[in-house]
């Protein structure tokens, strides 16, 4: 059994397999998941686990080089935006429709129980050296 880091075996495997510039998505419970993109569904009930908690925990175990967010998060969800800003990496903003198109390229979408608008982020893998 692991002593530290993410205990979820699916998430641990995805993070270990990422290459530079690969992407994963952390999503609220309403984001559509494109056909062909792997899903790790953590949602237990509305709000659990939260977007903020999952972003914090995953980013703590991942080399994140950049994030992509929907522009709409700025006005609609300052709490989720603040959680992502704490990662202290460059941010790219696109429309929500463009964001959904970008999710088609993700290695995986991690679905949280979050039920607030635009609580979605694309994490771009960096390197550890």
Swiss-Prot record:
It is found in: Cytoplasm. The active site is at residue 20. It holds the Pfam family RbsD_FucU. Pathway: Carbohydrate metabolism; D-ribose degradation; D-ribose 5-phosphate from beta-D-ribopyranose: step 1/2. It comes from the Bacteria. Its EC number is 5.4.99.62. One of its GO terms (molecular function) is intramolecular lyase activity. One of its GO terms (cellular component) is cytosol. InterPro entries: D-ribose_pyranase, RbsD-like_sf, RbsD_FucU. It catalyses: beta-D-ribopyranose = beta-D-ribofuranose. Substrate binds at residues 28, 96, 118-120. GO terms for biological process: D-ribose catabolic process. Keywords: Carbohydrate metabolism, Cytoplasm, Isomerase. Homodecamer. Belongs to the RbsD / FucU family. RbsD subfamily. Catalyzes the interconversion of beta-pyran and beta-furan forms of D-ribose. This is D-ribose pyranase. The lineage of its organism: Bacteria, Bacillati, Bacillota, Bacilli, Bacillales. The gene is rbsD.
